[in-house]
């Protein structure tokens, strides 16, 4: 949930490997539902004053088994959904706990199809390893050819498996960077490789992300302190 009661706020969204379902309303914009695809580069946005946003973040398998659609055309893009998508309306933004209850029930209702075991294992390995397994290793563990996996990824998500694993490694570094650990803790070959990959996906150096001036990196701002 994000509630911006004051003036317009500029923020930067960083790639995190998730698909986001956004319900929002502001003083100038009516209630709307938007589906955000995978991001591969930072995006600067302005959150208008008096804006309330409720967001639901999904892992990739949800696109096929809960949202029932390909998001390949939504790479670095968004789709405006019908305003009554999943039977939500502006009144649902008044109570976050009730919103969470309602969305949880809806997700369970949409999950009607048995999940392919190979896909389930593939994503379990990807997320548990935080993107640190190679495409070859994943292919061998799942017993699914690299070519078929990449075809599935490109058709369903608009991105290769290798590129997506890079985003997962990047996302896994958020907490370390926020804590001031500006050195590689994921599967980066060395410090220069770490800095290069972080800058490629964020547009900034690790130390700039750590400083997070004016809370502009919204995902860093909501990370818990340790």
Walk through the language-model features, giving the residues of each:
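Hydrophobic residues on short alpha-helical segments
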Residues: 123-127, 171-174
């Amino acid at each position: 949930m994000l509630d911006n009661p004051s003036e317009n706020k500029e923020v930067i969204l960083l790639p995190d490997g998730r698909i986001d379902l956004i319900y929002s309303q502001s003083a100038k914009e009516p209630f709307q539902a938007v589906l955000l695809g995978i991001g591969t580069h930072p995006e600067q946005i302005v959150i208008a004053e008096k804006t309330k946003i409720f967001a639901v973040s999904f892992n990739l398998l949800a696109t096929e088994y809960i949202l029932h659609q390909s998001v390949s055309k939504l790479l670095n893009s968004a789709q405006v959904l019908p305003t009554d998508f999943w039977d939500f309306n502006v009144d649902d933004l008044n109570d976050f706990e009730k919103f969470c209850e309602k969305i949880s029930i809806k997700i369970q209702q949409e999950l009607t199809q048995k999940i392919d075991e190979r896909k389930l294992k593939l994503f379990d390995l990807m997320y548990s390893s935080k993107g640190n397994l190679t495409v070859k290793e994943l292919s061998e563990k799942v017993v699914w050819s690299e070519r078929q996996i990449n075809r599935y990824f490109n058709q369903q998500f608009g991105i290769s498996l290798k590129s997506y694993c890079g985003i997962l490694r990047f996302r896994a570094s958020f907490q370390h960077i926020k804590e001031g650990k500006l050195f590689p803790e994921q599967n980066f070959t060395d410090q220069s490789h770490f800095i290069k990959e972080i800058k490629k996906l964020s547009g900034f150096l690790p130390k700039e992300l750590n400083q997070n001036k004016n809370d502009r990196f919204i995902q860093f701002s909501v990370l818990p302190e340790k």
